[in-house]
Amino acid sequence: NALGCMILIIGISCGFIYFNRFNQIDNQRKLYSERYKKYNNIDKVHLIDQEIVFSQNDKKISVNSHIKIQNRNHQEVDKVMFYLNPSLQIEKLTRQGEDIPYKRDAQVIIVEHKLHPYESLELDITYNGSIDENICYLDITDEEYYDTQTGSSILRFGKRYAFVQDKFTLLTPECLWYPSTFPPVNPEAPYNIRKNFSNYTLKVIHPDDRTILSQGQPSQSGDTMIFRNKEQLPGISLAIGDYEKKSIVVDSVQIELYNFKGHDFYSEVFPNISDTLSGFLQDVKSEYELRKGRKYPYQKFIMAETPISYTGYVRNWKGNSEQTQPEMVFLPEFATTLPSSNFKFAKKRMANWGRRDPQGAMEEIDVEMNVIRDFVRRVLLSEETFQEEGNTFVNMFSGEWSGTSKLNKYDLSSMYFNYAGSIYSQNFPIIDIVMNTMLKQEESDQGRHFFRMFNGMGDDQRAA
């Protein structure tokens, strides 16, 4: 009948729309991967300095980037390449106020300009638009990219890799929100990537009172927040949101915690720690630095809340996720999905254990400190984390729990190693990740770590 035919047509149409959406994503990701491969063997120049002036209007950003680059190759280059998010449109590209011809091929910008060995060039690039998240994580498998499961949870939170919204903005180097001269990924040979440590200055024009977070020392000038970095960094990030701030200085490092307004679920759980928190964090910091054999390299450390849908991946060839950046770590709102984050339950469990101690029950302050210590150790100071698998309710009724050990997205060791320096060899491009993996090791089994690191490499990369 007519009603049945109409329902059938509607169902087929919905299925086609659903399929077409994923087909478009696949086509875009394939296009961007092909563009990386197309220009992979062309000599790249080094980014020396970059000053970024950023503003946002609704879901669009406007940026002016002043760039200084240098040809550090031993031969002349006849073109200069930049990488920029493909949804960001270039208004003008100039040198000393004069337009310079360029070509655009998806995320690749080709500037026809010769540079002799070690010759420098300064350019201004003005661009605006939105962020295409399909450019992110082209070096992971489709299975992992489209997998929306989070451990054993039956909930699906979705996956986002960048935000440009009225109330929240989050941009990391992965989404190419500013020009870079080296690609962030190499889909053809993932381990053959180079880091480019540069001097960054970020100026964010903001007419409202939202909190702005980035690397570097912040200062206010009128309606502009300025971040100046003393250290050279492989990239910078930007977060803008309605945050509440808590801070403390530990061993000359400014530690800052930012949660969304109304999301402070933890203060009431730990009412007794204010007087002892500084000493506790000092002990944790000293112990961790002793284990790693080096000091924390920055002057501040930021923990910032993000929407739960914000997603990243730990890739063996990078050694870290986008959730962990120089000076910054991005944590899911309300600590959802993080181990040991149910603080009230953890306090009850810790108190019950203490009551069984023949020496007597623990004091409330000791219970709170042990809960925080367990959370910090499992979330921030562990290279691996245990993730439950299957269905929570099925596991609960069957009494059978299974899981696997996975690399920890929030592991801070990358701040001490991966983001602190790099080694590059054209003949042995994997040397940087090998050295960082070796340096990170403590008393654990190095053979196991190296097996994990090389897992997934192609034969050509193993033979390189």
What are the residue ranges of the model-derived segments?
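Extended, low-hydrophobicity, Ser/Thr/Pro/Gly-biased non-transmembrane segments
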Residues: 128-241
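A surface-exposed beta-strand-loop module
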Residues: 77, 87-151, 188-192, 221-223, ...
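N-terminal, polar/Ser/Thr-rich
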Residues: 1-61, 158, 162, 192-194
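Short structured motifs
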Residues: 47-54, 106-111, 183-189, 214-216
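Short acidic/proline- and small/hydrophobic-mixed sequence motifs that coincide with surface turns
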Residues: 61, 75-77
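Hydrophobic core residues within well-ordered beta-strands of beta-rich domains
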Residues: 61-65, 121, 198
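Juxtacatalytic substrate-recognition/specificity segment
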Residues: 202, 226, 249-461
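Asparagine-centered strand-capping/turn motif at beta-strand->loop junctions
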Residues: 68-74
